[in-house]
């Protein structure tokens, strides 16, 4: 199952905000059994957001977006989502109750900016926001699932946590382990990485992440990961590959790891 | 001038690594006068990287990528770049000298993994890497500029710093300032934001970033920014819009800011 992550917001494009949301979602979905195949960041513009949802729908089984769900003029995600799906935008009664109850508690009136957060594409299901006000949006379309979340990290995380049990890919497990290799240049470790990949072709993925300075002070973190239908099996494959890697790296530099 | 940012690496898609590179590049390019219009993250797969470069070329004047320049099997960026541009991949003599001199210093041989880092599309210019080994790649194609940088942040930043003077958009300035508004819900501030946008239509951009809890403890950071051909003018526009915003916000809650 393939997942696609969309981040909406000019502040990300301008580098004003680091996109920790995409990383969080990527992590959660990977461990939920998905292959995250693409992430995109688009501005607060309808046509760009529409493009992102359509690109996601053409490539993945699950699309998760963050940002653009609030009460301001540049919160355009649900409008764009409706357009991307050719669905009508309507006042969702369940979402309206959620939004209303939040403001009722404070005794403030429901202005059009507040009611805006209860509009959703026809057929969408609002997801309660335990932290903030704007509900998340869940919709199924052409066999694909779309989850639209707020951009505030605490709100995004809370709604995603709630939705996760339904999103998890049944019988699909991911496992990952890393080993830090010191005193071997990444270029010298490359043939070892290649060999371990060959020995476990299609079963594990090995990637080296240089953390030091290639020539003067080489430190390489090697990540080994696997996905499969048994938790025990993927863990076993990763551990065996790590063992192969460490034994070969030690033959280059016995103090490496 | 429009810029497009590509991040290459499975570790970003899996959320193992937070994409600080894209934020850094977005920030630097915004202040260099670009509109960053899209960011994408793609896996270490040729076809996906080719797609990203082509999507960038079809939309932007400058494309900056990070990741996939190293010595390992999954460093595929230059190969994909050559394919995206329909150019031959060749051993770049200038890049070869750069790579060779790094390893010569240590007296180690130039294995094929090390020489790999000197291959570039025909016509590309290598950019010296003062921190690591793999040179950056600069190439002009169909009136567009492409800058390909390593994924290690210190290396990426150093090469980008060096390249920046040539990339800067002449006579284009960006300025941004923020004000923190307390005790006014984002939904109550929305009409104020709208009004300030209307008063300065096309001149400034105003975006509210909720930082607290909408109903119980509202804290909203309002960002005002402008781009234009005079540094003084954009600064003046932003400061005037901030003044309008603060005066209107204070009429809702005098202690707000």
Swiss-Prot record, chains A, B:
Domain of life: Archaea
A family per Pfam: MoCF_biosynth
Gene3D superfamilies to which the protein is assigned, alphabetical: MoaB/Mog-like domain
InterPro entries: CinA (IPR050101), CinA_Arc (IPR023055), MoaB/Mog-like_dom_sf (IPR036425), MoaB/Mog_dom (IPR001453)
Family listed: Belongs to the CinA family.
Entry protein name: Protein Cmaq_1209
Organism: Caldivirga maquilingensis (strain ATCC 700844 / DSM 13496 / JCM 10307 / IC-167)
């Amino acid at each position: 199952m393939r997942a696609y992550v969309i981040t909406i917001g000019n502040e990300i494009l301008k580098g004003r905000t680091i996109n920790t949301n995409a990383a969080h979602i990527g992590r959660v979905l990977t461990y939920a059994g998905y292959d995250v195949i693409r992430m995109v960041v688009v501005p607060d513009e309808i046509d760009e957001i529409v493009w992102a949802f359509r690109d996601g729908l053409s490539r993945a089984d699950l699309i998760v977006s963050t940002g653009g769900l609030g009460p301001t003029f540049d919160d355009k995600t649900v409008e764009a989502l409706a357009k991307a799906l050719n669905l009508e935008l309507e006042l969702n009664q369940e979402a309206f109750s959620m939004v209303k109850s939040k403001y009722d508690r404070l005794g403030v009136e429901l202005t059009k900016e507040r009611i805006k957060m209860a509009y959703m594409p026809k057929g969408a299901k609002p997801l309660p926001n335990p932290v903030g006000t704007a509900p998340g949006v869940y919709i199924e379309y052409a066999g694909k699932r779309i989850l639209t979340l707020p951009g505030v990290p605490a709100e995004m995380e809370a709604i995603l946590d709630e939705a996760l049990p339904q999103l998890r890919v049944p019988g699909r497990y991911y496992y990952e382990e890393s080993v830090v290799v010191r005193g071997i240049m990444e270029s010298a470790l490359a043939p070892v990485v290649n060999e371990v990949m060959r020995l476990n072709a299609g079963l594990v993925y090995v990637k080296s992440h240089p953390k030091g300075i290639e020539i003067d002070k080489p430190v390489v973190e090697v990540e080994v990961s696997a996905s499969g239908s048994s938790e025990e099996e993927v863990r076993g494959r990763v551990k065996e590959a790590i063992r192969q890697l460490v034994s070969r790296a030690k033959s280059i530099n016995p103090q490496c790891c």
